[in-house]
Protein backbone atom coordinates (compact mmCIF):
# COMPACT_ATOMS: atom_id res chain seq x y z
CA UNK A 1 0.00 0.00 0.00
CA UNK A 2 2.91 2.28 0.70
CA UNK A 3 4.05 1.87 -2.91
CA UNK A 4 0.60 2.75 -4.22
CA UNK A 5 0.49 5.89 -2.09
CA UNK A 6 4.01 7.00 -3.04
CA UNK A 7 3.28 6.32 -6.70
CA UNK A 8 0.22 8.56 -6.48
CA UNK A 9 2.35 11.26 -4.80
CA UNK A 10 4.66 11.10 -7.82
CA UNK A 11 1.99 10.92 -10.53
CA UNK A 12 -1.18 12.50 -9.19
CA UNK A 13 -3.18 9.43 -10.16
CA UNK A 14 -6.44 8.71 -8.39
CA UNK A 15 -6.74 5.58 -6.24
CA UNK A 16 -8.94 3.86 -8.83
CA UNK A 17 -6.34 4.41 -11.56
CA UNK A 18 -3.41 3.25 -9.43
CA UNK A 19 -5.31 0.16 -8.27
CA UNK A 20 -6.23 -0.77 -11.85
CA UNK A 21 -2.87 0.05 -13.44
CA UNK A 22 -1.49 -2.84 -15.48
CA UNK A 23 2.02 -3.53 -16.72
CA UNK A 24 0.77 -3.21 -20.30
CA UNK A 25 0.02 0.46 -19.46
CA UNK A 26 3.71 1.10 -18.71
CA UNK A 27 5.52 2.14 -21.89
CA UNK A 28 9.10 3.12 -22.68
CA UNK A 29 10.37 5.91 -24.92
CA UNK A 30 14.06 6.90 -25.04
CA UNK A 31 14.71 4.86 -21.87
CA UNK A 32 12.04 6.80 -19.97
CA UNK A 33 8.78 5.37 -18.73
CA UNK A 34 5.33 6.80 -19.29
CA UNK A 35 1.79 5.54 -18.84
CA UNK A 36 -0.93 4.94 -21.40
CA UNK A 37 -4.00 4.12 -19.37
CA UNK A 38 -7.77 4.38 -19.24
CA UNK A 39 -8.87 6.81 -16.57
CA UNK A 40 -11.67 5.35 -14.48
CA UNK A 41 -13.44 8.55 -13.40
CA UNK A 42 -13.59 10.34 -16.75
CA UNK A 43 -13.67 7.23 -18.95
CA UNK A 44 -10.90 8.70 -21.14
CA UNK A 45 -7.59 7.39 -22.42
CA UNK A 46 -4.62 9.32 -21.07
CA UNK A 47 -0.86 9.51 -21.59
CA UNK A 48 1.18 10.51 -18.55
CA UNK A 49 4.94 11.12 -18.47
CA UNK A 50 6.60 9.90 -15.28
CA UNK A 51 9.08 11.68 -13.04
CA UNK A 52 12.28 9.90 -12.00
CA UNK A 53 10.82 8.90 -8.62
CA UNK A 54 7.80 7.20 -10.23
CA UNK A 55 10.09 5.48 -12.76
CA UNK A 56 12.37 4.21 -9.99
CA UNK A 57 9.43 2.92 -7.99
CA UNK A 58 8.06 1.00 -10.98
CA UNK A 59 11.47 -0.45 -11.80
CA UNK A 60 11.86 -1.65 -8.21
CA UNK A 61 8.63 -3.67 -8.29
CA UNK A 62 8.56 -7.36 -9.13
CA UNK A 63 6.27 -8.23 -12.00
CA UNK A 64 3.74 -10.77 -10.82
CA UNK A 65 0.52 -10.86 -12.77
CA UNK A 66 -0.95 -8.18 -14.97
CA UNK A 67 -1.53 -5.49 -12.32
CA UNK A 68 1.36 -3.26 -11.31
CA UNK A 69 0.30 -3.21 -7.67
CA UNK A 70 -1.03 -6.77 -7.60
CA UNK A 71 0.42 -7.61 -4.19
CA UNK A 72 -0.83 -4.42 -2.59
CA UNK A 73 -4.00 -4.71 -0.55
CA UNK A 74 -6.20 -1.93 -1.85
CA UNK A 75 -9.04 -2.54 0.58
CA UNK A 76 -8.91 -0.43 3.72
CA UNK A 77 -5.99 1.60 2.40
CA UNK A 78 -7.07 4.66 4.39
CA UNK A 79 -6.94 2.61 7.61
CA UNK A 80 -3.41 1.56 6.67
CA UNK A 81 -2.47 5.19 6.01
CA UNK A 82 -3.87 6.20 9.38
CA UNK A 83 -1.67 3.61 11.13
CA UNK A 84 1.32 4.57 9.00
CA UNK A 85 0.90 8.25 9.92
CA UNK A 86 0.40 7.44 13.58
CA UNK A 87 3.66 5.48 13.60
CA UNK A 88 5.38 8.45 11.95
CA UNK A 89 3.76 10.83 14.48
CA UNK A 90 1.92 12.71 11.74
CA UNK A 91 -1.16 14.25 13.27
CA UNK A 92 -2.76 15.59 10.10
CA UNK A 93 -5.63 13.59 8.62
CA UNK A 94 -4.31 11.69 5.60
CA UNK A 95 -6.29 9.78 2.99
CA UNK A 96 -5.25 8.32 -0.35
CA UNK A 97 -6.46 11.53 -2.01
CA UNK A 98 -3.79 13.39 -0.01
CA UNK A 99 -1.20 11.91 -2.40
CA UNK A 100 -2.95 13.39 -5.44
CA UNK A 101 -3.41 16.68 -3.61
CA UNK A 102 0.30 16.78 -2.69
CA UNK A 103 1.33 16.16 -6.31
CA UNK A 104 -0.80 19.06 -7.51
CA UNK A 105 0.30 21.50 -4.80
CA UNK A 106 3.99 20.61 -5.31
CA UNK A 107 3.75 21.36 -9.03
CA UNK A 108 2.06 24.69 -8.39
CA UNK A 109 4.56 25.55 -5.65
CA UNK A 110 7.36 25.05 -8.18
CA UNK A 111 5.59 27.47 -10.53
CA UNK A 112 4.49 24.91 -13.10
CA UNK A 113 1.86 26.50 -15.34
CA UNK A 114 -1.66 25.97 -14.03
CA UNK A 115 -2.66 24.73 -17.49
CA UNK A 116 0.09 22.09 -17.44
CA UNK A 117 -1.01 21.05 -13.95
CA UNK A 118 -4.60 20.82 -15.20
CA UNK A 119 -3.49 18.42 -17.93
CA UNK A 120 -1.35 16.30 -15.59
CA UNK A 121 -4.21 16.07 -13.10
CA UNK A 122 -6.70 15.33 -15.92
CA UNK A 123 -9.04 18.02 -14.64
CA UNK A 124 -11.67 18.75 -17.27
CA UNK A 125 -12.31 22.18 -15.73
CA UNK A 126 -9.52 24.64 -14.93
CA UNK A 127 -11.57 25.87 -11.95
CA UNK A 128 -10.87 22.56 -10.20
CA UNK A 129 -7.13 23.17 -10.58
CA UNK A 130 -7.53 26.77 -9.41
CA UNK A 131 -8.72 25.48 -6.03
CA UNK A 132 -5.22 24.05 -5.50
CA UNK A 133 -3.61 27.25 -6.82
CA UNK A 134 -5.50 29.23 -4.18
CA UNK A 135 -3.97 26.99 -1.52
CA UNK A 136 -0.45 27.78 -2.75
CA UNK A 137 -1.26 31.51 -2.88
CA UNK A 138 -2.40 31.40 0.75
CA UNK A 139 0.80 29.56 1.67
CA UNK A 140 2.89 32.19 -0.12
CA UNK A 141 1.02 35.00 1.64
CA UNK A 142 1.60 33.40 5.05
CA UNK A 143 5.29 32.96 4.20
CA UNK A 144 5.95 36.59 3.33
CA UNK A 145 4.11 37.75 6.44
CA UNK A 146 6.73 35.93 8.50
CA UNK A 147 9.50 38.16 7.18
CA UNK A 148 10.77 40.61 9.80
CA UNK A 149 10.20 44.33 9.42
CA UNK A 150 13.25 46.47 8.86
CA UNK A 151 13.89 48.91 11.65
CA UNK A 152 13.88 52.45 10.27
CA UNK A 153 17.30 52.99 11.83
CA UNK A 154 18.83 49.93 10.14
CA UNK A 155 18.12 51.17 6.64
CA UNK A 156 20.93 53.30 5.22
CA UNK A 157 20.15 55.79 2.51
CA UNK A 158 22.16 55.55 -0.64
Regions found by a protein language model. Give the residues of each.
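Basic, Lys/Arg- and aromatic-enriched nucleic-acid-binding interface segment
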Residues: 1-15, 19
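Active-site-proximal segment of tyrosine recombinases
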Residues: 17-18, 93-95, 104, 111-125, ...
